Every structure is written in C-alpha cells, then in structure tokens.
C-alpha cells in the first residue's frame, strides 16, 4: 500500500480542512484535482462566504478565480507554485525526499510519517482499501496546525 500511495500522480478528492492558529480555528471543504505537477486545482466549497474561489495551477502560472464575483487574476511564473501543503502529492514528494520518512501499520491503518523542512506530516491510510483517510500537519511544537479529512478520493493513476 505504501508503494501504491507513493506512485499516485493523478487524483480527485473532496477534503475537510481545519486550520488552527493560536487564536482560532477555520474549517473549509475543498475539492482538489491533481493531474501532475503542471496541472492541478483547488475549489472552495465551504464556507459560503468564499465558496467558488478556485486556485488553478497551469504550468508555471497560477490563476485565481471567484465565480461568485466573476473575478479572475493570473500570476505568471509564480515562484511558490509548488508550495501547497494541503495536497496529497505534496505529502508524497516530502515523503520521498525526507530523510526521516517512515511507515507503520496499526489498528487497520497504514501510518506514513515524514518530517521535512520543519513540518511533520502524518498520513493515515485504510489498510484494506488503500485510500487516504486523514492527514495531520504539525507545527514546530508538535501541535496539529492543519487537519485534513479525506471524504471522497478517486485515484486516476
């Protein structure tokens, strides 16, 4: 299953994301499509006040769209284009490049963990289906800063 996860390069998923800071916590529902490093997108489904916001990566360009306000912005040669901790392939790349990447099986789950660039990421996978269930991204103090719950996952590769 670990090799299966590490070979994913195209998928669609619907995730619940909780981002925690010192003072508050924000929750989002996001639809992600990933078709390789050059073609991926995220669309906010909830909360309603930012629903319809899309972040689309096309090659080295980043396009932001807000369908509710009929706005589009394009950023060419955007240098932080691949810096997206929320997507599954970001975890996969960090796992492959991380010196302290490891996995274990516990209670019917495969738990993959990596610690790269001061970010500890833990991915929990159902051992029977091979589908990701949740990911935790911890800050320097080992507190969960981002919690991602995979609601729907469709792997294309």
Model regions and ranges:
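Non-cytosolic head/periplasmic domains of membrane-anchored proteins
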Residues: 66-118
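N-terminal leader/targeting segments and the immediate start of mature chains
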Residues: 1-38, 157
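Short, solvent-exposed coil/turn segments at beta-strand boundaries
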Residues: 8-10, 33-40, 56-61, 106-107, ...
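An acidic-aromatic
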Residues: 34-86
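Beta-strand elements of well-folded, non-transmembrane domains
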Residues: 17-21, 34-38, 46-48, 127, ...
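Amphipathic hydrophobic-ligand
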Residues: 24-30, 51-57, 117-119, 144-147
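Gly/Pro-enriched, hydrophobic low-complexity segments
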Residues: 102-157
């Amino acid at each position: 299953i670990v090799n299966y996860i590490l070979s994913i390069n195209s998928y669609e998923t619907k995730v619940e994301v909780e981002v925690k800071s010192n003072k508050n916590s924000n929750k989002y529902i996001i639809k992600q499509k990933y078709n390789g490093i050059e073609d991926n997108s995220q669309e906010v489904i909830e909360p309603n006040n930012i629903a319809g916001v899309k972040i689309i990566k096309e090659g080295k360009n980043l396009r932001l769209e807000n369908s509710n306000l009929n706005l589009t912005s394009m950023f060419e040669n955007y240098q932080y284009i691949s810096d997206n901790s929320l997507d599954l392939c970001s975890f996969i790349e960090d796992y492959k490049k991380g010196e302290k990447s490891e996995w274990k099986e516990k209670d019917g789950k495969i738990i993959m963990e990596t610690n790269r660039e001061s970010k500890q990421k833990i991915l929990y996978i159902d051992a029977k289906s091979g589908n990701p269930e949740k990911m935790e991204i911890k800050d320097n103090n080992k507190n969960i800063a981002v919690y991602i719950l995979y609601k729907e996952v469709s792997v294309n590769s």
